[in-house]
Amino acid sequence: MRTTLDLDDDVIAAARELASSQRRSLGSVISELARRGLMPGRVEADDGLPVIRVPAGTPPITPEMVRRALDED
């Protein structure tokens, strides 16, 4: 299907680069990216609680930090 979209220059440049590196058409790359963006995010859970992944080396959030943040409100 053909349609016309106004895309930001940086978005189209990144999509073109991706299409070139994967030897795919620009349209197929943009379609795939749009599909991914439209899918609901999956929430990983452990014993019913959401799991939040952070980069290695990220300092932990301590109970004291939580208390201070709550006191600021």
Swiss-Prot record:
Keywords: Toxin-antitoxin system
Domain of life: Bacteria
Known role: Probable antitoxin component of a type II toxin-antitoxin (TA) system. Its putative cognate toxin is VapC38.
Protein name: Putative antitoxin VapB38
